[in-house]
Structure formats: C-alpha cells, structure tokens
Amino acid sequence: MKKIAYLIIAALVLLAALLFSLSSCSTSGQKFPESKEMILWYNKPAGDVWLDGLLIGNGYMGGNVFGRVHHERIALNESSFWSGRPHDYNDPDAFNYFDKIKKLVFADKFKEAEEMVNNHFYGMPVTQQAYQPLGDLLLNFSVTNDSIKNYYRELDMETGVVKISYTDGDVKMTREVFMSYPHHVMVMKVSADKPGRVSVEAKLRSHFTEEIIAQNNNLILNGTWKYIPERESWLIAKVEGTGMNFQISMSAIPENGKLEATDSSLIVTDANSVTFILTAATSFINYKDISGDPAVKCEKIMAEVKGKDFKELKSTHLKDFSNLMSRVHLKIGDPLMNDRPTDERVADLKNGLPDPELLAKIFQFGRYLLVSSSREGSEPANLQARWDEELLPNWGSKYTVNINTEMNYWPAEVTNLSECHMPLFHMLKDLSETGAKTAKTYYNAGGWVLHHNTDLWRGTAPVDAARYGMWPMGGSWLCQHIWEHYLYTGDVEFLREYYPIMKGSAQFLMDIMDFEPKYNWLVVPFSVSPEQGYFVDDNEEEMFLSSSTTMNVGIIRDLFPHCIEAGKIINADQEFGEKLAEALKKIPPYQIGKDGLLQVWIEDWKRGNEGHNMSANFGFFPGNSITLRRNPEIAQAIQKWLEPRQARTSWTNAWDICDWARLENGVKIDTVIRDFFHSRPPRLRRFLGAGRNTTPGTAAGPSIPPGMMRFGIGNNLHNSSSNQSDANFGFTAGIAECLLQSHAGEISILPALPVSWENGSIKGLKARGGFEVDINWENGKLATCVIKSILGNPCIVRYGEKIKTYNIKAGSSIKITGEI
C-alpha cells in the first residue's frame, strides 16, 4: 500500500509539473539552460525575506542577492568583520579553583562544583564577540513600465553566478553577479537588449558608516565598528568604544551613457550596460592586530582588476569555481521537475511530496556553501557560514565547536573539496597559541585547550555557563579534521606541519586527567556532556557536570590513536606515543545502561534534558572507535536511542542522517530525510534576546524572527533553523555517508542507500586512503562502480556482505559490479 501511495503522489507531482509547463505564467517566453542539475530558479524576486535571497561568496566576502526589480539590495559580509577587538579572555585566578572543583566532582558534590565553575572558572568576560554585517549595495533602477513581465531569477551552483532577467516594456533587462576568489571582488553586470536603456543609481550603506566618497566612477564607504548600546544579548559581550576599521570600494564602468557622482552615490543613465566591481577589506591582520589599512588593501585589489572587462573577470571566476563544484555530480529523481520553480518544489517537499531531484540539489547546495564561504586565506565558515544580516546574530554566529563548526566541515573531504578545509586548519594554529595560555592559566597544564566556543579573537577560555561551556574538548575534536585530511589526501608534509597541534591537544589531556575514586578509571576530571543533563537518584534538580562523559571517552579514543599513528608516519615522538597507548588502557569503557542505551556519563544516571546534542554517539559518528561490525552491541544501543528520537533542530536531524547511515539503514534514512524538511512551530528562544534588523541605522528590540528555530529550509535551500548553515553541511555529509563509507578500513559501496532512490548515480566522491569513486545503481542495487586510486594504496571493497581486496596502481582505476 505504501508503494502504491508513493506512486500516486509521484504521478500527481509529475502532472502538476506538466500543467505548470503548459500554463501561461510570468516566465513564459524565457529560455532555460539545457542542464539545470545545479540551478535554483524562481519567477519572483526575494522581497524582504533573507532566506529567499540567493547567496554568493568567495570565502573572503559573502553576498545575498535579492533580485528586486526597482530597488535591488545585495547584503554584504566580510569574513574578518566582527565586533570587539583583540582580547585575552583568560582569568588569571582560575587555577586556584581547579583542584577544589575536581575534589567536589570526585565527591559527587555536583551542584557545588557547578556553582564554583560559574563563579570562578570562566572567561573574562563570560561571553565572546559576534560576526557582523558589513553593509549593503543598493541599486535603484529606472523602470519605465508598471507591468514587469517574464521575471526570472537563478543561481547556478556550478558556476556561482546569479542571473536575473525581466521584460520592462519592450526591453529585456539582465543582471549577472558573482564573487570572484581569484580577484577578491564581486562583479555585477547590468545590461539591456536595446541600446541606451540602462539607468541606475548605486549606493552603499552600513550600520557603521563614517564616510561616503563618490568621485569619478568610484564609490567608497569607510567605516569603523562601534558598540551600539541599544542592542543587547547576554550571549555577546559588550565592548565599549570602537573596533576595527573597514572599507567597501566600488567602481562603475558603463558602456556609453552618462556617469555622474553625487555626494553619496553613482548615477548611470542611458547606458547600454554597466559593470560594477566591488571589494571590501578590514583593518584585521590577525587575532592580535587590527592595525591594517583597509583602504590600502582595497586599492591594491582594485588596481589588479583595472582594465579587465566583465568577460575576462567572469572567465577567470568560472575556471576557479567550476573546477571545485564540477568534481561531484549526484543524479537522482526526475529531471523534468526542474521545470518547476525551486520555491514551489520546496513548499511541496515540506508538505511531504517526494522530490529526490531536489534532494540532489540540496546535497550540492551544502558543497556550494562551503566553496563560497571557506577558501584559502579566508576565515573559516562560522555558524552562518559567511552570510549574516544581524548585529546580534543567533549565538553570535561564532565558532561553536561542540558540534557546529565540525559539522560545517564534515563534507569537505568526502565531497572532494579538500582545499576548502584549509581555513579551519589555519584557525587551529591560532587556537593552539591562545589555548596554550588557557591551559596554563586554568589547569596548569601543557599543550593547549579550547572549550565550546571561539571567535575571531581566538578566545579559548570557558564561556556562557557551566552547563554549556565547561567542556575542555573542543580543540581535541577539531584535531580529528587534521587526521581526516591526511587520510583522504595522504599529504605527509601537511601531517608533519600540523602534528604538533594534535600532540599539544593530547598533551593537555594527559596533564589534566586523573583517576576517579570509584572505578579508578583515568578521566577528564570535570566536564559536561554538551547540552545534556542528568538526575541523580530522586533529586529533582538537573545536573550537568560530571567526572567523565562518553563523549570525552570517544574523543580521547579518537585523538590518542591518531597521535600515535601520526608520530609513526613522521618518525617522531615514539616515547609520547607509548604514554598515550598506556593511558588508553586506563580510560573508561563504553557502557550500556540498564535501559539498553549507550550511557552518556560514567554512571547510569537518569537522562534529563536531551538537548540537541548527540554527544555520546561521537565514537560512532564522526569518530570510528565504534563501528557496526566491530561493536555490534554498542551499535545496537545507539540504534535503540535513535529509534524513538525526534530531532529538535535541523542540524541534529543532519547528525541523525549520518548515524543512520553508519547503521546502514536505508529505510530509516528515508524517514529522517523527510523529517529534515518538515516545518514545525518555532520554539521560544529562551535566552537569545536577539533583535532582528535589516535596515542599517535603526534600532531593533528583542524579537523572534520569522522561521527561526524551526525545521526545514528556506526557498534558497538554506537551513531555516536559526539561519545556521551547519545543517546544510551536515545534510550533504549525511547523503555522502549513505552512498559511500570508508571509516572502517574498507570502501563500502551504497551502505545505506535510501530505499526510495531506486535509480541514480554519484560521481567524484572521495574515500580515505586516496580514492575517487563513481557509483551507478539500478532498482536499488549496485550496477557499476569505478574506483580510481590516487595514491596506490591497497583497496578493500565491501558491497553488502561481499568483500574483496584490490591492488590498484596510482592513477589507475577498476570497474566492478554488484558481484565485486
């Protein structure tokens, strides 16, 4: 019956698509691209809704293009533009309380320990800084006809180009806009199919404007970040005075027509076309230094593109951007669905109508966001990747490292975007410096530590409150990304460069771990399990701090073996590796409680607020100290916990997909994917107090933005849960995990193929050990698989219960079928 219902729904969707294509609508007469595999398109502008805009970026900058006809807005961000200024968050008196807190925890006096942490073991201040909106480019167009026809707006994810077109009377107007990584500029061309019909006024604005200069064909906005007292959030530290300087610099290059500079704008009239070239820079040099000159930076960039026309700039951009995006292609579902506007398909998907082809787009959108927000030399992707319009973004749009930052980079290696991983590693170098001081100041330990959040200023001290921030494992988790990058690329020089960071994190843990008194296990002496509380006996008060958590055990079982193996590869630190190996014998085991679930803490306490975080599952995913076949009982305990679970945010749902993929359950994957997109009523934001404001220069009080804190995606495919990008990245990683796994020492093909994806193909996924994999399946079964070896390592292939070992020379490929 379910299959019949599915077929009926699919038939209705196809019928709707056919009727839509035959009907007269605002896009009639438009010529669509031949291939729309990576194209999102719409027949109306975005209006004022942030998640309706189309996102572009080059790592350094981000832009949200709304596509309005009369008054266009492109919201701008710059990766280093944050609130505040360089700051040391460490409390010099913290270590005086370390032993006292440890003794309280070891004596099961958890409430007293938590109070002491909150009062004496936190950062100064107890909150960090926030990512900030840079400003807006505003374009006021001269429109001659009240009735605009044939409106069309698209984002081509393969090229990173947004196109907008419409008919104004008898003239077709077209805009193209992209952000170029090679040239560090945003480029926009406005053109008409008849001469002399382009007239537009260009303005810049920002919350932090100090000066606007319009001269010749140049428009410059100079600004300085300053504290705005009308806006408050207890999750973002107040900083009196000013912070970094910045500049937005733009030039206008018209073809024919007239160009006039007013006091604060550029006006182009009666041109055939006009090309706008824009860049931005801040005074940020590094986390310790904001003495740079943004004007000099902008002048250098603009000088390098001077004389280059739109065609040349676009060509260079396409070579760079498409090289990354075209590496992977996922084809599932009916391509005829592409004849429907993306927003209509999103609405149907939220209502439960199947659309696998749209799921393929959402998979690619996660890759697109990573390419657009994380490039060599830029800051890493933060909670909102690169796109923020609020002065008080949710959770400061920081780097939350108890899951969110890591999830941002889960798809980097497996979906063939290793280069986009690099900004995270560069930040780790900074954090190992600031974290060394925190390790010494708070724990009198060597190595380095990072707790659950950091910001541009590389704060590493505990922040927010004990139940959130008393978790010294953030740096250790991030070190997993170093090892993963090595496993996928085989880059020994990279490993040699970053091994000291892994070692430093392990050294910190070795220095602080102690034997708890009840079981004599070696543990991190006090920590929370992120966002999960417990009840002791019949005590009605929820506790968070404990002497050992399963997540901490999982991270240690991840980091220590990686350090040992890395030391062998680079021929270093054999003695240190031996100490780690001895410590591994003394840490707590994974435990299954009386309810059959994987325990979260050292004791089998009653679970309190489940929160969002699936922390106890770390060893299963993204770690691999627990695997389905090596640890079947523990895997079963994880499955038992997942089965009744209803994820509370989109990013937790994305983690669910990854866990079910590791459980190789394609039936459940279908359900979890469907849940990912269902809209649900927003939950009250208990503590954010964030004001929403889209207009620079005006105040905003506390409010709950439309669509915040709910499941699903916006019309532009971005996660609509708190505007965070992590769920998009996590969804992409989860889909890749369904189709290919390589964490258990073998390449597993189609381990968790969603049952509704009967036919399809994936091209270009990467596997650990240095392999590139293409897979085709028919009727839910493997048809062909091509495995190319990059490094020449031995290759163990699994399909279901069939296993075979191949020796493939570097640069060579093998082709196998379901019989392998």
Regions found by a protein language model. Give the residues of each.
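Acidic/histidine-rich catalytic neighborhood
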Residues: 504, 508-566
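Bacterial N-terminal signal peptides that target proteins for export
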Residues: 1-12
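Bacterial Sec-dependent signal peptides at the C-terminal "C-region" and cleavage site
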Residues: 16-33
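C-terminal catalytic domain of Rieske-type non-heme iron oxygenases
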Residues: 385, 389-390, 522-524, 532, ...
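Secondary-structure transition/capping motifs at alpha-helix termini
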Residues: 193-196, 372-377, 485-496, 508-521, ...
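Aromatic-residue-lined binding/catalytic grooves and analogous aromatic/hydrophobic interfacial grooves
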Residues: 28-467, 473, 478, 482-486, ...
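Catalytic cores of secreted or luminal carbohydrate-active enzymes
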Residues: 122-144, 725-768, 772-773
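Extended, hydrophobic alpha-helical segments in both membrane/secreted and soluble proteins
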Residues: 404, 471-485, 494-511, 652, ...
